Amino acid sequence: LHGVYYDFLLDIEGERIQSADPYARACGVNGTRSMAVDLRKTDPEGWEEDVAPQKEGEQIIYELHVKEFSWDVSGGFPEHVRGKYPAFCCENTSLYGEGTYPTGTAYLKQLGVNYVQLMPVYDYGSVDETKDGFNWGYDPMNYNVPEGSYSTDPFHGEVRIRELKEAIQALHRQGFRVIMDVVYNHTYSLDSWLQKTMPWYFYRVWEDGSVSNGSACGNDVASEQAMCAKYILESVLYWAE
């Protein structure tokens, strides 16, 4: 079934609802359809042997946005990888490619950085992956799927997974441990796959029927619910592993 796209038709209280799979690990462009994936087929060469560098000395952490990190033409990155996951595989880049002032991971090495913290790289809802766009990514849509706008091919669900693995592998090879910024306290909108699959279970609702909005994003995930907590823990473990 690898590469097959699918969604669910759910009968809930007499209503037929179409939804993507909230547990999916791959999806199509813009995250509207889930994709069955054999994760072994997304492994770059040497992935099974890849390990993070050993923790040594002081932790010097550099937080970055995947697109911003390599988007500017002055960075000296090949055009087809600018703003994409594969940019992290480009070592020894320099300003305008002139070889004088380091950019990218070469610049991070010069700073003495040993941890790279990636701003959200799961699939989020505010950027049209078929066009050029920008957002920080704090609006999750598919929690267990990499963001497609950072991929060189957002239309084929396996590509974004492989390219993110390659990026992490390249960062490890260059001496960086990787931290992933995650957002489990709210979703892109209340019209989420979690809501469609089990209405009002995954969101915190007050006794008067109003939706909790402590996140100031229009909704709060109900992490106190047993299956919601399980979902979050399984998602974190999936990314970590």
Model region roles, listed by residue range:
Residues 1-90:
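The feature marks proteins involved in alpha-glucan
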Residues 67-241:
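Substrate-binding/active-site clefts of carbohydrate-active enzymes
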